[in-house]
């Protein structure tokens, strides 16, 4: 800092520089090229990762022997057509992730969450129909109020025995993380599962 003014550091050679032509006078017709530092537009800066943020919830029956699943069989153009999945959807502006989960369960199943816990987070690069990235917050709902709907606009709702869950048609990646949702380890898991052309490419996770 010199006399209250910041010291401007010279950009390195990796910074983007462009030449701007200036006319030195209307009558002279001569040009002078002046280097313009646009270091703040450095080409080496990566684009920010902006996945779609969503929730995915699994509702347990009162005796904890069954889980409420949606069979996506209503829309022919559904990316999930024919598969079983938990309930959930995209987070909306103005709500936190827990509020998003409660809203989605109410909208999709007609019940109110009374007790739930965050079981994990999952980063799904490339999972979307057009290759969009998704970031999911996965909840287990162990107490609710109301009577679940039998169906919604996406498909039918079915109580499935936990022992039979892995026999259902589902995304191949779900078979890897679902055991972590229902096991006895109290620690949430945090995983990454890249997809390409609808197929899981890899899977890793940690627990804290």
Locate predicted features.
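Unchanged
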Residues: 91-114, 124-180, 202-208
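A conserved beta-turn-beta hairpin within the catalytic core of GNAT-like acetyltransferases
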Residues: 77-82
């Amino acid at each position: 800092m010199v006399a209250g003014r910041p010291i401007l550091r010279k950009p390195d050679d990796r910074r983007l520089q462009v030449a701007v032509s200036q006319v030195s006078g209307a009558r002279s017709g001569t040009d002078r090229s002046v280097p313009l530092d646009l270091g703040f537009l450095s080409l080496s800066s990566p684009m920010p990762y902006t996945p779609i943020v969503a929730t995915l919830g699994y509702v347990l029956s009162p005796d904890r022997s069954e889980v409420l699943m949606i069979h996506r069989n209503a829309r022919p153009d559904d990316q999930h057509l024919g598969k079983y999945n938990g309930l959930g959807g995209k987070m909306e502006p103005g709500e936190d992730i827990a509020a998003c989960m409660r809203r989605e369960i109410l909208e999709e199943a007609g019940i109110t969450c009374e007790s739930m816990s965050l079981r994990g987070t999952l980063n799904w690069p490339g999972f979307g129909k057009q290759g969009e990235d998704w970031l999911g917050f996965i909840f287990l709902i162990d107490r609710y109020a109301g009577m679940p709907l039998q169906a919604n606009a996406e498909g039918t709702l079915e109580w499935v025995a936990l022992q039979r869950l892995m026999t259902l048609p589902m995304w191949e990646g779900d078979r890897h993380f679902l055991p972590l949702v229902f096991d006895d380890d109290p620690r949430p898991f945090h995983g990454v599962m890249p997809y390409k052309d609808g197929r899981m490419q890899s899977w890793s996770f940690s627990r804290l």
